Amino acid sequence: MPAPTALQRRPEEFAENVSEDVSMEASAVPLPEDDADLIDMSIEPGTAIEAAPDALADDMPMTDESGRPKFAPAKSIPLAFRHEQRKVPIPPHRMTPLKTAWPKIYPPLVEHLKLQVRMNIKTKSVELRTSKSTTDTGALQKGEDFVKAFTLGFDVDDAIALLRLDDLYIETFEIKDVKTLQGEHMGRAIGRIAGKDGKTKFAIENASRTRVVLADSKIHILGGFKNIHVAREAIVSLILGQNPSKVYGNLRTVAGRMKERF
């Protein structure tokens, strides 16, 4: 609190001194030399708002009559070429059939899938490799499945279907997966599946439109997903000891339903 005898300024003089101090501080602050950063207040606010929709119009997709957007077709991007290689081992008992059928095996791999193929006698394997002419990304996998199907015992003409159709599969299971059999019981189960002169196996193949290979106690089935299911059910019934005549009847019923469906 000031002393009562101290001189006091009038309010008008105090306000003038404060305004002079503020103006001096403002003049001391440097202004930017570039006028580009300054906002031109002479521009009308409506012009900027009108230009914005024109800029967005180029980015908005065109729509058809139903309101669905129309996009321009994507440009093809060149894929980076990379050498990929697969090696399929060949069992000893399939080397001789492979050498015999080799003139029928490599043409579809080279001409259709554009792969480089060679049979390595030393390592007993078939080597597959992509080339610059290979366009299908799944060509190497298809070629491996084709060679594996031949090594499992399928005919070349049946295995070629894996290259032409995409919905074919190979399912493998053993008799012991269904029922534990040993000795003569195992042989009788295999005999029931094959039938006399292979008639039962052929009947299962024709009814289910699949191909079946009996390799000792292993069973390989080539076909579509539903067709494999039909063939597997028939084979499992025979392994469990069901009468073959009853299995034939079930196959006729299923085959009739499949014909009506297709």
Curated annotation (Swiss-Prot):
Pfam families: KH_PNO1_2nd
One MF term in the entry's GO annotations: unfolded protein binding
Lineage, highest ranks first: Eukaryota, Fungi, Dikarya, Ascomycota, Pezizomycotina
Alphabetized SUPFAM superfamilies for the sequence: Eukaryotic type KH-domain (KH-domain type I)
Official protein name in the record: Pre-rRNA-processing protein PNO1
CDD domains: KH-I_PNO1_rpt1, KH-I_PNO1_rpt2
Domain KH: 183-235
The protein's role, per its UniProt record: Required for small ribosomal subunit (SSU) synthesis. Has a role in the processing of early nucleolar and late cytoplasmic pre-RNA species.
Residue ranges, compositional bias (Acidic residues): 14-23
Subcellular location: Cytoplasm; Nucleus, Nucleolus
Family assignment from sequence similarity: Belongs to the PNO1 family.
Segments of this protein annotated with the region Disordered: 1-34
Record InterPro entries: KH-I_PNO1_first, KH_dom, KH_dom_type_1_sf, KH_PNO1_2nd
Annotated GO biological process: endonucleolytic cleavage in ITS1 to separate SSU-rRNA from 5.8S rRNA and LSU-rRNA from tricistronic rRNA transcript (SSU-rRNA, 5.8S rRNA, LSU-rRNA); endonucleolytic cleavage to generate mature 5'-end of SSU-rRNA from (SSU-rRNA, 5.8S rRNA, LSU-rRNA); proteasome assembly; ribosomal small subunit export from nucleus; ribosome assembly
Keyword Metal-binding assigned: no
Record's keyword terms, sorted: Cytoplasm, Nucleus, Ribosome biogenesis, RNA-binding
Membrane-crossing residue ranges in chain numbering: none
Subunit structure: Component of the small ribosomal subunit, ribosomal RNA processing complex (SSU RRP complex).
